[in-house]
A protein has these predicted regions:
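Short, small-residue-biased leader/transition segments that mark boundaries at the very start
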Residues: 6-20, 617-628
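Conserved G1/Walker A P-loop phosphate-binding module
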Residues: 102-181
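Conserved C-terminal guanine-recognition region of P-loop GTPase G domains, centered on the G4
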Residues: 193-259
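Canonical P-loop GTPase G-domain recognition
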Residues: 240-292
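Interfacial loop/helix-cap signal at membrane boundaries in integral membrane proteins
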Residues: 355-389, 394-404, 438-480
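Membrane-embedded alpha-helical segments and adjacent helix-loop junctions characteristic
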Residues: 428-525, 616, 620-625
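Alpha-helical membrane segments and immediately flanking helix-loop junctions
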Residues: 517-565, 572
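Transmembrane helix-loop junctions at the membrane interface of multipass transporters and ion channels
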Residues: 558, 562-585, 603-604
Length: 629
């Protein structure tokens, strides 16, 4: 299939759209390296350079049919073998779509005699889990009818959200943060893992982006190892069909051993069937029929033998710790220190575990973490090869690519950013927001005059009269008059966020912001800070790095929010009446300058010596947003 050139190179040296190379070694350590592997950057995987950021860093690469952004410093840890011959196309199954049968498959994977239905009236709790940007929050809204924010920036679901499934009494679904794996390195992953392990939901609803199944199934496999009843919701199937693709759902069900339901959360298609299957597997506690993802003869059976040996070794410990033994075994095999601590193995057992894992590494020719990741992606490749017909490139993707050439182009990205933000602030402070503010001020003024006249006519006590007119109407009214500006600014920022432009700005600005110790994703809270500092600080919770969150929170107040406008206006009118516009601009840029100065100061003092390693890699849907770490 491949011709590999003996010479090797670093991924960061590839030219745009270079011939598909193969990863040879993956460097890094700890969380960084584990995230490399979880995202599919494993020895033997194919990669294509897609683009460089306007400032040359980070870069976007394509792997496993999806895009990733990598900083050059991290990309330099990955060594590749260059491959100059074309890659042979993989055979795909027949594209003829097979309709998914309706509900009525209850007990398909288990003997009815072995089923033990839960008592009537018992609460059926569900964990809604999936990758970021796969439509999880949209599905949660369809299931519960709640009005939760649906955004397009990775990490929009930070807190836990609960709701009862509409039309189903005694049910509770929890919307968990979007994650890519069950590795315990980010706050989102820890929240999701602890919820499933500690709160014991009766079932899991795993939502998968049908346009990018290969990426999403990595999390699915780890959820199946938890041995909790689950269903798989194939979301965005309407997009797959419209672009000539299909999924052989019944075959996928047989391969995975769990119900697979095609849906479109945005169009409310297939939701009733999904609910019926979810309630059924939870009520009858039908656990996944498959948790072993490697055959005894795969790569000599090294991983298969190691996992089963570890399961036999830790079976009693896993039962006492209330951790599914298969999940614990795979996590121990890849070096999960938290699981090792929870199992409380004695020294002899730890030595035996290390011997088993070292033997696996020797036989497989890969280190422990890479061997487990490779096992999972090999299984995913088999499933997709047998059941998935990839859709053609959609018109939306083509259009998005053309727009990206301008918005993230080397010479056009920064001018576009300046122009777009200038347009947003001009429309906010001089056109729409200012007009609405004037209307509101007139209405408040008319209402103040009306109440003032009425209280004067009624002979109200002067103290009470002054409290109402001067305190409430003039005081609170002056604050309310800025509400249209705040609402207008957030309206435009939400459009930029939902369109994916904010994520592209993070891709463009990452190198610049890293010079002051921040990441490209910090640009979003800071831009929101121009509207109001409070939501800007709250938006910093989406940042995966604790250091980045702290610095962003401390620097966001330096942005000139709308609450500072009346103060600026008062002083400029009093001291610089002829140059008020210029002084206002200088005050805005002065705040930015002070933020940069304080960031550089904090790097050498408050945050000196703190871990500055790169945070989680995020994938991005080709037609949606970039996800910069």
């Amino acid at each position: 299939f491949f011709f590999i050139v003996p010479a090797t190179t670093e991924i960061s040296t590839l030219s745009l759209h270079d011939a598909l190379p193969i990863f040879r070694t993956v460097g890094g350590e700890g969380a960084l390296r584990q995230h490399f592997l979880d995202m599919g950057i494993i020895p033997g995987a194919e990669v294509t350079m897609v683009k460089y950021a306007p400032m040359g860093d980070p870069v976007e690469v394509r792997i496993h049919s999806y895009e990733l952004t990598l900083r050059l410093a991290d990309a330099g840890r990955i060594v590749i073998d260059e491959m100059r011959d074309a890659v042979k196309e993989k055979e795909q199954p027949d594209a003829k779509a097979i309709p998914h049968p309706g509900f009525g498959e209850g007990g398909k994977y288990h003997n009815k005699a072995e089923e033990h239905p839960l008592p009537e009236g018992e609460l059926l709790s569900f964990a809604l889990a999936g990758n970021q940007n796969c439509g999880k929050t949209t599905l949660f809204n369809q299931l519960t009818g709640s009005n939760q924010h649906v955004g397009n920036f990775p990490g929009v679901t930070v807190d836990r959200k609960d709701g009862e499934i509409r039309g189903q009494k005694n049910t509770l679904v929890t919307d968990l943060p979007g994650i890519y794996s069950m590795s315990p390195y980010s706050s989102e992953e820890i929240v999701t893992r602890n919820f499933v392990l500690n709160e014991h939901p009766r079932g899991i609803i795993n939502i998968v982006d049908a346009t990018n199944i290969e990426r999403n199934l990595y999390l699915t496999m780890q959820l199946m190892e938890l041995d909790v009843p689950m269903v798989l919701a194939l979301n965005m199937m309407d997009e797959v069909r419209e672009n000539g693709g299909s999924v052989l759902v019944n075959q996928m069900e047989e391969r995975l051993g769990i119900p697979v339901i095609p849906i479109s959360a945005a169009k409310n298609e297939g939701i009733d069937e999904l609910v019926a299957h979810a309630v059924h597997v939870a009520k009858y506690q039908e656990k996944p029929g498959r948790k072993d993802f490697c055959e005894a003869n795969d790569h000599g059976g090294a991983v298969h033998r190691a996992l089963h040996a570890i399961m036999h070794l830790i079976e009693d410990h896993a039962a006492r710790a209330d951790i599914p033994v298969r999940f614990a075994a795979s996590k121990l095999a890849e070096g999960d220190a938290l699981i090792l601590e929870q199992l409380a193995l004695d020294e002899n057992e730890k030595e035996m575990l290390e011997h088993i894992v070292c033997q696996m590494e020797t036989e497989r020719g890969l280190d422990r973490a890479a061997a487990i990741a490779d096992m999972r992606f090999n299984f995913i490749e088999k499933v997709c090869r047998e059941t998935v017909v990839k859709p053609k490139e959609s018109r939306e993707h083509v259009r998005s690519t053309e727009i990206d050439r301008v918005l993230t182009g080397k010479y056009t990205a920064l001018p576009c950013f300046a122009g777009i933000m200038a347009a947003v602030f001009f429309l906010t402070f001089h056109v729409i927001g200012a007009s609405l503010q004037s209307v509101l001020e007139i209405l408040i003024g008319k209402l103040t005059e009306l109440v003032d006249s009425a209280m004067t006519a009624w002979g109200v006590n002067p103290v009470l009269h002054s409290l109402v007119i001067d305190g409430i109407f003039n005081g609170v009214g002056s604050v309310l008059s800025f509400l249209p500006i705040i609402v207008t600014l957030f309206f435009f920022l939400s459009i930029l966020e939902d369109s994916g432009y904010m994520a592209r700005v993070a891709f463009v600005m990452d190198k610049l912001l890293r010079k002051i110790g921040l990441s490209g994703r910090s640009i979003v809270p800071m831009l929101v800070g121009f509207g109001c500092t409070v939501p800007g600080v709250m938006a910093s919770r989406t940042l995966p790095s604790e250091r980045g969150r702290k610095m962003t929170i401390l620097l966001t107040p330096f942005m000139s929010c709308s609450a500072k406008l009346p103060i600026y206006a008062f002083f400029t009118a009093a001291f610089f009446p002829k140059y008020s516009a210029l002084v206002m601009v200088l005050l805005y840029f002065g705040g930015i300058f002070m933020a940069v100065l304080m960031a550089m100061l904090m790097q050498g003092t408050l945050f000196q010596g703190e871990d500055r390693k790169s945070t989680r890699l995020n994938s991005s849907h080709p037609s949606r947003s970039y996800a910069v770490f």
